[in-house]
């Protein structure tokens, strides 16, 4: 959409207009949203809004630019096997979310089949006043902003808001999934569906994630990398959305220590259910998280964008302000309870990428396992 021109301008003309005014216009896409960021000086604010309006309301999706974007994305996918960590996380995500939209990443086949008409139809169905939110920060007043937005976007008509997609349910534990690659290192990912931002468990899960794998003092780093010396990269990821989240513990290790690292990771995940975290560790995690949160909102743009995304996700208006309070209220008992609830071994997804002929122990020691053919 950004590089494909508009009904009023060819792609090159649109690029020239942006360059002449030193306008930075960026479009990115997540699983839930299309994000447009416009940065411009005060002198060219009106001109930039015209360009933004044309791109948002009447994109051209120029065939040549569309084909270029398609080829770039396909080449990225073809190179994915050269990135073992990226490939493992792609397959883990598909297994964790299964048939939900979050479990259907782009494939070479889907990109090959994409047409300009598909893009235009997607735009007609999903981009309209009923689905778009705009946040503005800078040297303009609220009144001036409302007037300018009304002037440039007031005539926009379109479809009604999109019906939200149902959150995925946690998959029951199945076999350990194995991706064969003749590489000297293995990638291990063990994860679960977790609580969303609107869950009472969100703050405790955030703290638990940080303690288990969020820094140099985390349990996984201290045990697997520092004490055992078996991983060049290890940690956890907790990615909360509004109604659900995803938690994953990961490690990259030599082929000859793959099973040992799987055992250690599983042991750490079980330990936070069995024993309370000590007060010093809990205090360290809470302080680190609250300080990081504060430094994430130093500019007016960061605050405006954060508030808009909260509104987009249907979160309370004071969600950002209450975050430190929620983190600091987490107790050791909360961590044990959340670990028992969300790290249930009966709902666990495990993916291992590597060369099983070089593993220290067979994967069968962890139960049934199945080789996975990666479908790019």
What are these regions (language model features)?
Residues 72-88, 172-186, 225-231, 242, ...:
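Short acidic/His-enriched helical or mixed secondary-structure segments at domain edges of catalytic enzymes
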Residues 4-9, 38-71, 215, 235, ...:
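M16/insulysin-pitrilysin zinc metalloprotease superfamily fold
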Residues 1, 18, 36, 52, ...:
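Buried hydrophobic packing residues in well-ordered domains
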Residues 1-39, 82, 105, 215-230, ...:
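M16/MPP (pitrilysin/insulinase) zinc-metallopeptidase core fold and M16-derived inactive scaffolds
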Residues 10, 14, 45-48, 65, ...:
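Stable alpha-helical elements in mature extracytoplasmic
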Residues 99-106, 128-129, 133-196, 297, ...:
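An aromatic/glycine/proline-enriched structural segment found at the starts
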Residues 133-137, 251, 283-376:
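C-terminal regions of mature proteins
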Residues 5, 80-129, 149, 240, ...:
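Scaffold signal of the M16-like zinc-metallopeptidase fold and its non-catalytic homologs
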């Amino acid at each position: 959409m950004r590089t494909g021109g508009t009904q009023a301008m060819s792609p090159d003309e649109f690029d020239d207009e942006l360059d002449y005014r030193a306008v930075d216009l960026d479009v990115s896409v997540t699983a839930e949203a299309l994000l447009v960021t416009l940065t411009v000086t005060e002198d060219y604010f009106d001109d930039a809004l015209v360009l933004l309006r044309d791109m948002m309301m009447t994109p051209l999706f120029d065939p040549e630019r569309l084909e270029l974007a398609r080829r770039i994305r396909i080449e990225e996918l073809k190179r994915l096997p050269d990135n073992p960590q990226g490939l493992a996380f792609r397959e883990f995500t598909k297994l964790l979310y299964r048939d939900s939209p979050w479990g259907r990443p782009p494939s070479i086949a889907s990109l090959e089949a994409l047409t300009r008409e598909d893009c235009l139809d997607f735009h007609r169905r999903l981009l309209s006043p009923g689905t778009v939110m705009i946040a503005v920060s800078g040297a303009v007043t609220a009144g001036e902003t409302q007037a300018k937005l009304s002037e440039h976007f007031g005539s926009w008509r379109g479809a009604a808001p999109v019906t939200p997609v149902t959150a995925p349910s946690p998959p029951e534990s199945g076999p350990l999934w194995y991706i064969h690659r003749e590489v000297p290192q293995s990638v291990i990912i063990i994860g679960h569906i977790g609580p969303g931002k609107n869950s009472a468990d969100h703050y405790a899960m955030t703290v638990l994630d940080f303690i288990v794998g969020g820094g140099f003092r985390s349990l996984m780093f201290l045990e697997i990398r520092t004490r055992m010396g078996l991983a060049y990269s290890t940690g956890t990821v907790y990615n909360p959305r509004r109604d659900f989240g995803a938690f994953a513990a990961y490690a990259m290790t030599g082929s000859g220590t793959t099973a040992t690292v799987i055992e250690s990771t599983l042991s750490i995940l079980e330990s936070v259910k069995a024993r309370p975290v000590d007060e010093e560790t809990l205090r360290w995690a809470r302080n680190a998280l609250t300080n990081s949160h504060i430094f994430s909102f130093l500019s007016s743009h960061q605050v405006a964008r954060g508030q808009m995304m909260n509104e987009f996700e249907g979160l309370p208006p004071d969600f950002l302000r209450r975050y430190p309070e929620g983190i600091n209220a987490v107790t050791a008992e909360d961590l044990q309870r959340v670990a028992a609830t969300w790290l249930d071994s009966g709902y666990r997804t495990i993916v291992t990428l590597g060369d099983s002929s070089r593993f220290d122990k067979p994967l069968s020691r962890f139960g049934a396992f199945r080789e996975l053919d990666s479908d790019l």
